[in-house]
Design a protein with these regions (language model features):
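A short helix->beta-strand "capping" segment at the edge of beta-propeller domains
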Residues: 45-72
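Blade-loop segments of beta-propeller domains
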Residues: 66-70, 103-129, 135-136
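C-terminal motif of bacterial Sec signal peptides marking the signal peptidase cleavage site
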Residues: 24-26
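Short beta-strand elements that form the blades of beta-propeller/WD-repeat-like
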Residues: 84-89, 129-135, 168-175, 216-232, ...
């Protein structure tokens, strides 16, 4: 009887060991698969090099924004849908224009604490046929229809700098990451926290990038955390590493926690990412200069360097649409602007890539 029990325990122990080993192998295989799927972009041949515009840009669309005599402040952010252009300016006004003509549709500046009002408009995103506006001060999201009619709002409980609509709610960039609430926060459609990801201990002055989320033409959402060499793809299971940049000997150390540290190190660090068609574009800062890297995911072609400043239309992309990079000028401050147009305070440029 005793021998039978010992054998039974022995076989149970052997079975558990086998299951444990198989589990470890599965984790290792999954890790290997993730590493294989992670695309590393090597950025080392860029110093003192100009990127010829014809090498990366196929065409440029100009959208002259007709403001109809209304004052437009400096542009803070832009969203473009299939039929509309939305502009948030630093005078706290939200604008709607027709796309691609730039004809004026509506301007709102509903500043206050009442229903449908905001205090400090900060960021915008499109989703579910609505325009969502972030009010930084009140930690609120306001929803509008295509022509800026107010529909609804909700509040979230943490300071955020950027956000984007996803299928089952929103992703936020949390300014004050803690052990309990990490840098990227996933909420439902009512602003209730579902989960948070990507722990971070860096100081606030390390958050250089204005935009931390982009959506490609297929609807995939990508996440660029502040001061990061990695871009993450949003999935039902959370963020998964998708791309990584490697600056070789100029790569900054992982333990940098303040802007002073990175400035003193004179290493390169990313300040923005875009994913348009089959291109990954990142702008980065090194030794007092802003550089760009274009990576073609189809053929592996790379173009690295700084933008040609002799061109009439400046290449300073700030945002992206489904099919191009978006830059802008304030026409009153730009002597090279032609043709001059009445009631056109600003012009957007959509750069289409080769």
């Amino acid at each position: 009887m005793l021998l039978t029990m010992n054998l039974k325990h022995y076989f149970i122990a052997i079975t558990l060991c086998i299951l444990y080993i198989l589990n470890l192998m599965g984790c290792k295989n999954q890790q290997d698969a993730n590493e294989k799927d992670l695309l590393t972009i090597h950025i080392e041949d860029y110093e003192n090099k100009i990127i010829p515009r014809p090498a990366v840009i196929s065409s440029i669309d100009t959208i002259a924004l007709n403001t109809c005599g209304n004052f437009m402040g400096d542009i803070k952010t832009v969203c473009i849908s299939d039929s509309m252009v939305y502009v948030l300016d630093r005078a706290n006004a939200v604008w709607a224009f027709k796309f691609p003509t730039g004809d004026f549709v509506k301007r709102i500046r509903n500043v206050g604490h009442g229903n449908g009002e905001y205090v400090s408009a900060w960021a915008m995103t499109l989703g579910d046929s609505l325009l969502f506006l972030m009010d930084f001060d009140t930690k609120s999201i306001l929803a509008y229809d295509a022509v800026l009619n107010y529909k609804s709002s909700f509040r979230y409980g943490f300071p955020a700098m950027d956000f984007i609509k996803v299928k089952d709610g929103f992703l936020f960039l949390n300014l004050l990451a803690t052990e309990k609430l990490h840098r990227i926060v996933h909420t439902n459609n009512l602003g209730e926290v579902q989960q948070s990801y990507l722990p971070s201990k860096m100081s606030l002055d390390m958050i250089y990038n204005e935009t931390s989320f982009v959506r490609d033409k297929n609807g995939e959402v990508y996440i660029f955390p502040p001061f990061s060499n990695e871009i993450y793809r949003w999935t039902s299971g959370g963020p998964k590493p998708a791309f990584r940049t490697d600056f070789g000997r100029n790569t900054a150390k992982d333990n940098v926690k303040s802007s002073y540290d990175i400035t003193e190190s004179e290493r390169a660090f990313n300040t923005g990412f875009f994913i348009v068609d089959h291109h990954i574009i990142n702008n980065f800062y090194h030794s007092g200069k802003t550089y760009y890297s274009f990576y073609n995911m189809k053929d592996g072609r790379q173009d690295q360097g700084y933008a040609d400043t002799t061109e009439v239309i400046p290449f300073v992309p700030r945002w992206q649409s489904s099919n191009g990079l978006i830059g802008y000028i304030l026409t009153n401050d730009y002597d090279k602007w032609k043709p001059q147009k009445d009631s056109c305070d600003a012009a957007l440029f959509v750069f289409h890539l080769k």
